[in-house]
A protein has these predicted regions:
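Short charge-dense sequence patches
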Residues: 7-15, 103-112
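Acidic/glycine-rich C-terminal interaction modules and beta/coil loop segments
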Residues: 52, 108-159
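Surface loops and adjacent helix of pleckstrin homology
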Residues: 66, 94-95, 101-103, 109-110, ...
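Mid-length scaffold segments of soluble, non-membrane domains
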Residues: 73-104
Length: 163
């Protein structure tokens, strides 16, 4: 039995497998195009093609949200739809309804999933340069209606629905 364990630990194959276990995830993060799976319920699609080239035309982005009292874990990546771009007119009314260039894009809930009152992001005006307003399709989607604009520097990858 001990000889079998020694044989395993002295095998080149063992060290190659260990190296692959540690190297593959690192390399996967760096791929220019990859498949990502989201567990969030804020968008109907679950499987996405993501691109490291931020010049790729896409209306979806993978990003790290700004740190607020509603985003406690700063390592969680969000995938949302860009609903309003820089230089667009964003308006929120007294009913917590959001409009981009006069087109309705969503309503902020008064309560979170635990029935606690939740503050919404209030802004009316032209979206500043390099800022984006992102949303999900779920009524309780945790998005820009609560944490505000996403800065271009927070974008990790562009995304397109795979299915």
């Amino acid at each position: 039995m001990l000889n079998n364990i020694k044989t395993i630990f002295t095998s080149k194959l063992f060290y190659i497998l260990v190296a692959l276990i540690f190297i593959v995830p690192f390399l996967y993060e760096k791929l220019p195009i990859r498949i990502d799976i989201t567990q969030q319920s804020s968008l109907p699609q679950k499987i996405w093609l993501t691109y490291s080239d931020l010049a790729v035309e896409s209306e979806y982005i993978l990003f790290i949200p700004p740190k607020t009292k509603y985003t406690l874990d700063s390592n969680i990546e969000y995938l949302k739809k860009i609903s309003c771009n820089e230089d667009d007119l964003l308006v929120v009314d007294e009913n917590r309804d959001y409009f981009c260039n006069d087109k309705y894009i969503g309503t902020a809930s008064k309560y979170d999933g635990n029935k606690n009152l939740i503050e919404n992001f209030v802004f009316s005006g032209i979206i500043p340069k390099n800022k984006y307003f992102v949303t999900g399709t779920h009524p309780l989607s945790h998005d820009s209606k609560y944490f505000g604009f996403i800065d271009k520097s927070q974008i990790l990858r562009k995304a397109k629905p795979f299915f």
